[in-house]
Amino acid sequence: MQIEIKTLDNGSAGTAELPDEIFAATPRADIMARVVHWQLACRRAGTHKVKGMGEVSGTTKKPYRQKGTGNARQGSLRAPQFRTGGAVHGPVVRDHGYDLPKKVRRLGLISALSQKQAEGKLVVIDTAAGMEKTRDLAAKLRALGWRSALIVDGASVDEGFARASRSLLAVDVLPTIGANVYDILNHDVLAITVAGVEALKARLGFGAAEERSAA
């Protein structure tokens, strides 16, 4: 498919060819949900921890004799029914991450890209560079009407541009390798540079070598 290349000044810089296999596929909401759940699970620190009966401080002596007191039998003041007792089946330090097949992750990214294109929220820009001041970048994005935007560049991002965007709320700049389903869906506008489009094609297996073999 053909799409117009925009500039940050809201001008035109020609057209770009986007492969239908990446940007015009049928979005799979179930696959995107699986990938997002996987991403969020992997992001969890897993440092939650409570103390059990064997970890809380206190005596291990039986509080009183088994019979004859009129009270319910007790074996330890560390039991969970007491105020200073340990927790039962509480959270422990662990890794919440799990494996997700590479094909599922790839299909999730393609679905997210196609979803943005179908919604008319996909923009191809000529470059994401030459901007050093946050004030200047904010003015350009405001003129474009981008309140929430994810900008995907090529193999690396321009340091000055990334620094200028760092203080802007709901604006993120990522290299191609960092493009992911969660951030794409979490932003209103997805802006990809020309270099980013080529890098995405290579990352998803639709690079120049495959195009030559198909021809």
From Swiss-Prot:
Alphabetically list the UniProt keywords: Ribonucleoprotein, Ribosomal protein, RNA-binding, rRNA-binding
Q: Where is this region: Disordered?
A: 51-88
Q: Which residues form a coiled coil?
A: none
Give me the Gene Ontology terms describing cellular component.
ribonucleoprotein complex; ribosome
- The domain of life for this entry's organism is Bacteria
Gene3D superfamilies for the chain: 3.40.1370.10
Write out the GO MF terms: rRNA binding; structural constituent of ribosome
Q: Does the keyword RNA-binding apply?
A: yes
Q: What biological processes does GO assign it? A: translation
Provide the family line. Answer: Belongs to the universal ribosomal protein uL4 family.
Query: Assembly state and interactors?
Result: Part of the 50S ribosomal subunit.
Main role?
Answer: One of the primary rRNA binding proteins, this protein initially binds near the 5'-end of the 23S rRNA. It is important during the early stages of 50S assembly. It makes multiple contacts with different domains of the 23S rRNA in the assembled 50S subunit and ribosome.
Q: What is this protein called?
A: Large ribosomal subunit protein uL4
Task: Supply the source organism for this entry.
Answer: Granulibacter bethesdensis (strain ATCC BAA-1260 / CGDNIH1)
User: What gene name is given for the protein in this entry?
Assistant: rplD
